[in-house]
Swiss-Prot record:
Function: Component of the MRN complex, which plays a central role in double-strand break (DSB) repair, DNA recombination, maintenance of telomere integrity and meiosis. The MRN complex is involved in the repair of DNA double-strand breaks (DSBs) via homologous recombination (HR), an error-free mechanism which primarily occurs during S and G2 phases. The complex (1) mediates the end resection of damaged DNA, which generates proper single-stranded DNA, a key initial steps in HR, and is (2) required for the recruitment of other repair factors and efficient activation of ATM and ATR upon DNA damage.
List of residues that carry Phosphoserine: S274, S343
GO molecular function terms listed in the Swiss-Prot or TrEMBL record: chromatin-protein adaptor activity; damaged DNA binding; DNA-binding transcription factor binding; phosphorylation-dependent protein binding; protein serine/threonine kinase activator activity
Gene that produces this protein: NBN
Gene source species: Gallus gallus (Chicken)
The protein's name in its UniProt record: Nibrin
Domain BRCT: 101-191, 221-311
InterPro entries in the record: BRCT_dom, BRCT_dom_sf, FHA_dom, Nibrin-rel, Nibrin_BRCT2, Nibrin_BRCT2_sf, Nibrin_C, Nibrin_met
Family named by the database record: Belongs to the Nibrin family.
Gene Ontology process terms (BP): DNA double-strand break processing; double-strand break repair; double-strand break repair via homologous recombination; meiotic cell cycle; mitotic G2 DNA damage checkpoint signaling; protection from non-homologous end joining at telomere; protein localization to site of double-strand break; R-loop processing
Motif (Nuclear localization signal) on chain: 461-467
Polar residues bias: start-end ranges: 446-455, 490-500, 568-577
Length: 753
């Protein structure tokens, strides 16, 4: 940028823009010089023009020309122009008039390098720099005065600008500078146009963009050895600008003694550059050099440390081959910012170790498998007593609280399993095939049919408890007698008591066994024998087989009777009440230990409600076992009674089914319809439009804001070639026309007189 500085003393310089004529005069002009009588109204004219376009990006200075139009003259370096024009150079002294209007001509270099700008920003920047008399270059050199970036990123140009102490500004700085020159106001400062730092690994506060003289000699005394020509070409200029020495080590050179010096930094090839290495010998040679460095407790310097050393102005932490990177600050900070993004999609809490999370998921699968296995327990008759005891115990532990789902507390479940293992039970691992069955839907038809009886067993638990307690008040007994109870509910309550007693019997983990069941069960007499035998497997297997056979008999009875038990007649109600009274009488006769022990029964009920999940004492287990034996006996009696009274079952009942009626429209594309519509013509095709989503809407038209204007990049060489070609064609046309005129010339022209 050209400017005229007053030579007499301090004063505001007058800056000149390219392509503008500045008139120097006393009145009504751009460059006013007042209080001087020797200055004319239009004393001189100053013009700044661009030089001829060159293909190279060498620094070209605009031409400043002065033309004298004054009365008393204009002097350049003491010589008078006398109305002529002259080009000025930096340092010339110009005197307007004969008095003290003296100025010094100076040229302020303006070479700008841009980085990470789009096409529109580059175009606006070129126009502003050309008006200011500067030059825009693509690569950083020593002559560069500014680096233009929209946001600061650590690039080679950024490192070079920091080393040279040049300001890094935004593109808006030069537009504001041009406005200030045109209006002759205070120029903007580069500090107010610093771009934002776009490096999360470094941080905004840690990066100082101001000029520091110590950066110019940051690499003094150090030698950087590059193993590839690409790295040497890219980072070599930055090292040289910082006062260091950049060398390229050839593959043929085998001596590595120069690499073990503490002032020699071997630049690491890196992951991306190692993929470019072509030959196997090149990779082996690089690995051998790195092995030599490791053997001498040295390390290779990554490319990023060259930039970090310039930014933080330290070669003790960065670019130091003797310092082992024990705390990778930049890498750790980068990883800490990338890590939460990937961990947000995880459903496992990060505070839980992976092993703990895996164990937790395994426990959930195990609980689901236990629930499915125990639901199918009623239709299975297994010979492995120990395994059935374990599964039944886990079912009891899960179902003891009705509001608890399948995923109960895993710790309590494991503790119960561990406790029961001390009683001599054998833990069998679940097979993978059973675990896979958890994901299958439970709406299978065979399983619904087999488990249909289990749906009734969970309903009558409260009634069962009410019937087992003989301490029920007279008012409750009267209400129960007045309320009709079908035969199915009695059978369900007895069967549910058998099922619950079987669960409690095998789930508590002791070896209490029923001694035997004589044939006197039908005559309301049962001998209960509680023993602690060491080998109870044969008797227990026999009892379980008997119970399973009874349950299968119940299922056959329910399946053979497709009746609606909720709509019973008066005869059914009377039979239910009589069965209920007989059952209570049988319970009163059969329970030997429960007679006279009402207080103990109340205490057992309190313990059962309060101590859920705890190991019951031996006395409680024996009482529960006695209750379960009574329930089994009642179930068998009711079953026999049901077989005896099968002839008295109600008949002539009405079966009600609810069906939803749906009006179905006839198909329009049937053959008969087509024949009638088309007047009986064969092979006549009818077509119709198939609706699709969005058929009634307007189509989406790409246009407007969706289109981006294509900005073609101007090619100066092509334009110049086209211009020269056009001039050449015009010249040839003129020559041809001149030749034609000479050919038609006739010296003997006859003129008419």
């Amino acid at each position: 940028m050209w400017k005229l500085v007053p030579a007499a003393g301090p004063g505001e310089p007058f800056r000149l823009l390219v392509g503008t004529e500045y008139v120097v005069g006393r009145k009504n002009c751009a460059f006013l010089i007042q209080d001087d009588q020797s200055i004319s109204r239009s004393h001189a004219v100053l013009t700044v023009s661009r030089p001829e376009t060159t293909h190279s990006q060498s620094v070209s200075v605009p031409v400043l020309t002065i033309k004298d139009t004054s009365k008393y003259g204009t002097f350049v370096n003491g010589s008078k122009l006398s109305g002529a024009s002259r080009s000025l150079q930096s340092g010339d002294r110009v005197n307007f008039g004969v008095f003290e209007s003296k100025f010094r001509v100076e040229y302020e270099s303006l070479v700008v390098c841009s980085s990470c700008l789009d096409v529109a920003q580059k175009t606006a920047l070129n126009e502003a720099i050309q008006q200011l008399g500067g030059l825009v270059v693509n690569e950083w050199t020593k002559e560069c005065t500014h680096l233009i970036m929209e946001s600061v990123k650590v690039t080679v140009k950024t490192i070079c600008a920091l080393i040279c102490g040049r300001p890094i500004v935004k593109p808006e700085f030069f537009s504001e500078l041009m406005k200030a020159v045109q209006s002759r106001q205070q120029l903007p400062t580069p500090e107010s146009f610093y771009p934002s730092v776009d490096e999360p690994a470094i941080g905004i506060d840690n990066m100082d963009l101001s000029g520091h003289p110590e950066r110019k000699k940051i690499f003094s005394g150090k030698t950087f050895v590059f193993l590839t020509a690409k790295q040497h070409k890219k980072l070599g200029p930055a090292v040289i600008l910082g006062g260091g020495e950049a060398k390229l080590m050839a593959e043929e050179r085998k001596e590595t003694s120069l690499l073990v010096s503490p002032e020699v930094c071997v630049v690491d090839v890196g992951v991306t550059n190692s993929q470019i290495l072509g030959s196997e010998s090149m990779r082996n040679w690089t690995d051998s050099i790195l092995a030599v460095l490791e053997s001498n407790n040295l390390r290779a310097i990554p490319e990023a440390e060259i930039g970090l050393a310039v930014i933080f102005m330290s070669t003790e932490i960065y670019c130091n081959p003797q310092r082992q990177p024990d705390n990778k600050a930049v890498t750790a900070s980068t990883a800490s910012k990338v890590r939460p993004v990937s961990s947000q999609s995880s459903t496992v809490d990060e505070t839980i170790m992976p092993t703990a999370a895996a164990d937790y998921s395994t426990l959930n699968v195990a609980d689901t498998e236990i629930e499915e296995q125990t639901c199918m327990e009623i239709e299975r008759t297994t010979s492995q007593t120990t395994r059935r005891e374990k599964v039944a115990f886990q079912q009891a532990a899960v179902r003891e609280n009705p509001s608890t789902s399948g995923t109960v507390n895993a710790g309590m479940l494991i503790s119960r399993v561990n406790r029961t293992s001390g009683f001599g039970q054998k833990n069998h691992p679940h097979s993978p095939s059973k675990i896979l069955e958890v994901d299958k839907p439970r709406e299978c038809t065979p399983r619904q049919q087999s488990n249909s009886i289990t749906n009734y067993f969970h309903v009558a638990r409260k009634r069962e408890r009410a019937e087992e307690g003989e301490e029920t008040s007279l008012s409750k007994q009267a209400k129960l007698e007045k309320k009709p109870l079908p035969v199915s509910e009695c059978t369900e309550s007895s069967a549910s008591s058998a099922w619950n007693s079987e669960k409690e019997q095998h789930g508590k983990g002791n070896n209490i066994q029923l001694g035997r069941e004589s044939g006197e069960l039908a005559s309301d007499k049962t001998d209960i024998k509680i023993t602690f035998s060491e080998n109870p497997a044969p008797k227990k297997r026999k009892e379980l087989d008997d119970v399973s056979e009874d349950v299968e008999t119940l299922e056959m009875v329910f399946e053979s009777r497709d009746l609606d038990w909720e709509e019973q007649t008066a005869n059914g109600d009377q039979e239910a009440q009589s069965n209920k009274r007989k059952k209570r009488c049988l319970e009163t006769k059969g329970s030997r230990t429960e007679e006279g022990n009402t207080k103990q029964r109340e205490e057992n009920e309190m313990l059962r409600k309060e101590e859920v999940g705890s190991v019951l004492t031996l006395e409680d287990k024996s009482k529960i076992k006695e209750e379960s034996s009574v329930s089994i006996r009642n179930k068998l009696i009711n079953h026999n009674k049901l077989e005896d009274d099968s002839s008295r079952l109600p008949s002539k009942l009405l079966l009600t089914e609810f069906r939803s009626l749906v009006v179905s429209c006839p198909r329009s594309n049937s053959p008969t319809m087509r024949n009638t519509k088309c007047r009986g013509q064969n092979n006549f095709k009818t077509f119709r439009k198939v609706p699709y989503p969005g058929a009634g809407q307007l189509p989406y038209i790409i246009g407007g804001s969706d289109l981006v204007a294509h900005q073609a990049r101007k090619n100066s060489e092509l334009e110049e070639w086209l211009r020269e070609e056009l001039e050449e064609q015009n010249r040839r046309a003129r020559e041809e026309s001149l030749a034609d005129d000479l050919f038609r010339y006739d010296p003997n022209v006859k003129r008419r007189r």
